[in-house]
Amino acid sequence: MDNRNLSDVQPGDVFVYPANSNRYGHAVMVADVAQDPNTGVKAIMLVEGFMPARSIHVMRNWQDPFISPWFILDEGADDLTFSLFQFDVTDLKCFPPQ
């Protein structure tokens, strides 16, 4: 997978939490992106699945239930917390173009 800048996020992009020696990795896929036409602020809707990876669900925004299932992107942040995982902004990946 290729790296993607947070400012260029698109549906189908994936936040990849790398596995280490004592923990499984995790992935969260971007299902949709919305942008406020006045401010340019972006919000993303995410989906994830757990083990076994055979069903996925839209993630709930526990930190801001008023806008759930959307997550507001802070493009100046170094990391983002979704669900149980904290992702670095460099963890955003995309599939290479065909």
Each language-model region and where it sits:
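Short beta-strand-centered aromatic/proline hotspots
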Residues: 25-35
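Residues that flank catalytic or metal-binding motifs in active/ligand-binding sites
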Residues: 11, 24-26, 42
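Extracytoplasmic/periplasmic, Sec-exported soluble proteins
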Residues: 4-7, 22-25, 38
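Conserved active-site-adjacent core of cysteine acyl-enzyme catalytic domains
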Residues: 1-10, 58
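Active-site-proximal beta-strand/loop segments in catalytic clefts of secreted hydrolases
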Residues: 18, 33, 47-50
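Short, solvent-exposed loop/turn segments that connect beta-strands within catalytic domains
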Residues: 36-42
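Low-complexity, Gly/Ser/Thr/Pro-rich intrinsically disordered linker/tail segments
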Residues: 43-45, 49-98
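Structural motif
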Residues: 7-19
